[in-house]
Amino acid sequence: MLAAVNPKTQEFLNLLLWSTDILMRPTFRNLTDSYESWAYRSGLLKQVTRLEQQQLIERDTNSPDDRLFRLSAQGRLHVLGGRDPEERWSRNWDGQWRMVLFDVPTGQNAQRERLRRYLRDKGFGYLQNSVWITPDALEEERRILVGGKINVESLVLLEARPCAGESDAEIVAGAWDFERINRRYARHLKILGEWSGGSLRNEAAAKALLRWAEEEREAWLDAVTNDPLLPERILPSDYLGLPAWRRRMEVLREAGRQLRTFNRQ
């Protein structure tokens, strides 16, 4: 679950992600004439204090002047959309599909919709509205769903392999709408292509970069939060998530260097 932060704070965290040369757990310094200081003016210190309280950034204990902060692991995960794409794509898969089958009575529409929403938010694909599928173990679902008052006639959790010749690629194509997923990544790639390099020699250039950063962040989150981030071995061959991620790292690394050229006039 992502921490609740307002759009301005989300924008600030995103800025910290690419304010250095690497997209790992980057550090920024609160310098008087930095791009960050210009972008948030007198609100910078307040932002830092709030984010530290939320454990989204942390102080660098090795800094002698106590003015170095970095994104915490939790903060980095938040900026990426709540999941680490590389970690999700690279996870092992045992070849077993897990299925959730349910038949909630028509008089319990609210419960049925709540269950569907939960499964959709967790990245499950659906073969039918009452048959949902995932490559991941159902440990959390066992605790949440089976722990309730649901009997076997209403809900069944299964581990299965196809037995009629269906390929994993066919199952993936039937359970997730990768055409729609790719359209979101294509939009994000288009915005990445609109990034303009060069030095930030005036406020007009800095404002343009800030606008682009907001568009890029929104497009990325729209794409990644609607992506199941399946293990790489079962991703469609034309899947755009991987190239979008790689290009994002390249562009944001360069944009991070661009921040250091800011010259307030």
What label would you give each PLM region?
Residues 51, 96-97:
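Mobile, glycine- and charge-enriched loop segments
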Residues 89-96, 104-106, 115, 122-133, ...:
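Basic nucleic-acid-binding interfaces
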Residues 1-91, 109-110, 121, 135-139, ...:
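Long, contiguous binding/interaction regions
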